[in-house]
Regions:
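Sec-dependent N-terminal signal peptides
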Residues: 1-25
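Cyclophilin-like peptidyl-prolyl cis-trans isomerases
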Residues: 20-265
Length: 265
């Protein structure tokens, strides 16, 4: 069984579970709760009509069209180890609009390098935002394609020191309760979640305030305890989500922009 990406703190301090249920966990694991004391309330999502007011992430050429397949290089996870630029940007074109993640390699070099390679080979194209907990986090990063998910199942990277706090808009890897289990799953903080800093969640990038207007609009009305099973997303891909959770928003494309996009691929 694939390892569900989540985080746990002691019950006495308030439990935070990061991930979705698997069949084995449904009877004993309570649904994830948004933090009460440590996280500030995030602004409510603006109505969909506000999407028209979203800023363009860049004035350059339009985003590439979504691919119907995947880059075969993604099947060789161990070979994708290019070093990321010191700073680079990734444009996410989604079913709600566009937002840009600015990555600072100095914050978390290992995580930044992994993200750079994933985006360079279009790993996140067509993937869904499968877990959205209001005023807490937005989680994504399971491939839309089962062969790709299988190739990255054990491609974990080492943990890194937390150099930045998990503030609203900051982007961080999901992981299990075990050390060194970061892989491809990402979350965006919807609030200031400083409690995650102590658990070793090290941000590597940030979405600016304008981009967060789009992130705030991602569909969040599926209850946390009735959301999709991560194992099944990995095994069955996007059709599993489209059938059971058709209102989930998804990523059309996630591409490097600016100087990073101009580097040889």
């Amino acid at each position: 069984m694939k390892r569900v990406k989540w985080f746990v703190t002691a019950v006495a301090m308030g439990t935070l579970l990061f991930g979705c249920k698997t069949k084995e966990q449904t009877a004993e694991t309570p649904p994830p709760e948004q933090p009460k004391a440590e996280a500030t309330a995030a602004p409510k999502a603006e109505p969909p009509a506000a999407a028209a007011a979203q800023p363009e992430a860049t004035a350059s050429a339009p985003a590439p069209a979504p691919r119907s397949g995947y880059d075969r290089a993604l099947l060789r996870a161990a070979l994708l180890k290019d070093k990321a630029p010191d700073t680079f940007q990734v444009k996410f074109t989604t079913t709600r609009g566009d937002f840009v993640v600015t990555v600072h390699r100095a914050w978390a070099p290992i995580g930044a390098d992994r993200f750079y390679n994933l985006v360079k080979h279009r790993f996140y194209d067509n993937a869904s935002f499968f877990r959205v907990v209001p005023a807490f986090i937005v989680q994504f990063g399971i491939s839309a394609y089962p062969p790709v998910s299988a190739a990255w199942e054990k491609a974990d990277i080492q943990d890194e020191p937390v150099t930045q706090s998990n503030k609203r808009g900051y982007v961080t890897y999901a992981k299990t309760s075990m050390p060194n289990t970061r892989s491809t799953q990402i979350f965006i903080n919807l609030a200031d979640n400083a409690g995650l800093d102590r658990q070793g969640f090290s941000p590597f990038g940030v979405v600016d305030a304008q981009g967060m207007k789009v992130v705030d609009m991602l569909y969040d009305q599926y209850a946390s305890n009735s959301g999709p099973d991560q194992d099944q997303i990995s095994k069955l891909g996007k059709p599993y989500l489209d059938k059971g959770w058709p209102k989930l928003d998804s990523i059309k494309t996630a591409t490097l922009i600016g100087l990073a996009a101009a580097k040889p691929q």
